[in-house]
Design a protein with these regions (language model features):
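Extended beta-solenoid/beta-helix repeat architectures
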Residues: 14-99
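Short, intrinsically disordered N-terminal pre-domain segments
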Residues: 1-15
Length: 99
């Protein structure tokens, strides 16, 4: 399952077809096109907050990464925690310089 849960307008949504419709409505086509597994996310003020799950491939355009496994191309956003094995282009919390 690509998406396990999306919290949207304070309401958890767990049915994948409903999650995809929400992502389309908000313009997050890049996330729909990415290869993900068991993603638990929130949408707050038109920003993706990734709480857990796997992002295997695709371009992460912008959002806040709280936790999970990232293997894609990070174009911009805030990386707070998790496993990073992707390519970092720009953003805050560059995982390649962590000690």
């Amino acid at each position: 399952m690509k998406f396990k849960e999306v919290v949207y307008n304070g309401t958890p949504v767990t049915e994948e077809h409903k999650i995809v419709k929400i992502l389309q409505k908000e313009g997050f086509y890049w996330l729909i096109d990415s290869e993900t597994e068991d993603a638990c996310i929130e949408i707050i003020h038109k920003t993706i907050i990734w709480n857990s799950g796997n992002f295997y491939s695709g371009n992460w355009h912008y959002g806040i990464w709280k936790n999970g496994n990232f293997y894609g191309r990070w174009e911009n956003g805030i990386f707070e925690n998790g496993t990073f094995k992707g390519k970092f282009i720009s953003g805050i919390g560059d995982p390649s310089v962590r000690v």
